[in-house]
Amino acid sequence: MRTTTRRAPRVGIGGPVGSGKTMLCLKLCQRLRERLSMAVVTNDIYCSEDAQFLIRQSALPAARIAGVETGGCPHTAIRDDTTMNEQACRALEATFPELDLLLVESGGDNLTATFSPELVDAFIYVIDVAEGDKIPRKGGPAIRFSDLLIINKVDLAPLVGADLEVMARDATAQRGGRPFLLCDLKREHNLDAVIGWLEREVLFARTAAPVG
């Protein structure tokens, strides 16, 4: 009898280089791993540094963390040709059929980066205030259409002259009612709100137990 592997709920995490994508993966794993079965797929162009970071930090057991070396443009691997990421996700789902949540971290990319809906069920886009308070105003598909926008590293705003009120106003204008959060992920400021969003918008979709 043929059996099929249950697809785990998948959440994409995108954003520019250094914005805090891997930190978000780490913090979510640390906070949720005791009550959820989790795995992570990371993307880098020429290495697996983000996967190795998560392994060194003991975010999850190493077998639950897979690093994809895309060898090219990051958004191609999450939107245009998702084959490598899909294979990595399916391998983890086959090994851990009880998965409650699978995170897919993109390589660092620009404001046009979005995830294919065939690869993930929802996606979070992470920017940081050190990039300048004009970033939300620039718009682009990632700013406008991500399911959740995180404006990270709010603790740095006074040091770089970024106006958080301006960033919040512009994010509101760009996103048409879609949620955004001001966070300091390293210190877990507003991490509870991110987890609350995951619980409401993604984890409710947890499917039945695997077959076979």
From Swiss-Prot:
Q: Which Gene3D superfamilies match?
A: P-loop containing nucleotide triphosphate hydrolases
GO cellular component terms, semicolon-separated: cytoplasm
Instruction: Recall the GO molecular function terms of this protein's record.
Output: GTP binding; GTPase activity; nickel cation binding
Localization per Swiss-Prot or TrEMBL: Cytoplasm
| Pfam families, A to Z | cobW (PF02492)
- Name the source's superkingdom: Bacteria
Q: How does it assemble?
A: Homodimer. UreD, UreF and UreG form a complex that acts as a GTP-hydrolysis-dependent molecular chaperone, activating the urease apoprotein by helping to assemble the nickel containing metallocenter of UreC. The UreE protein probably delivers the nickel.
Protein name per the record: Urease accessory protein UreG
- Taxonomic source organism: Opitutus terrae (strain DSM 11246 / JCM 15787 / PB90-1)
